[in-house]
Amino acid sequence: MATFAVTLGHGPRWDASRQIRDQRGWAEHARFMDGLVADGFIVVGGPLGDGQQTLHAVDAVDELEIRARLSADPWARAGLLVVAAIEPWALWLDCRRLAPEPRADSLTRGEQEAV
């Protein structure tokens, strides 16, 4: 498993006269994306700057898995969303990682007995 930076952009059927949540099929798209978050596939994500693109941190085996899963998005199937870029992302700062175990010599006597 690796982490990727995935940039999504507006597809050819995006209605520029509407806000993101007013686009056709918003509820279905939102449910789909919430499912990817619940599965641990999307770690974090959201619109960038003016909202023309969104950036997601995605945990996946490879680019093929990412493209396959995102192609099932109702917005992708409707032409509202396209994958603009997928890049491997070497996260050096990641709050999802567990804190290191404390060194035994730094524990108090009570803490040592509890371990």
Describe each model-derived feature in a short phrase.
Residues M1-V115:
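Conserved, structured core segments of small domains
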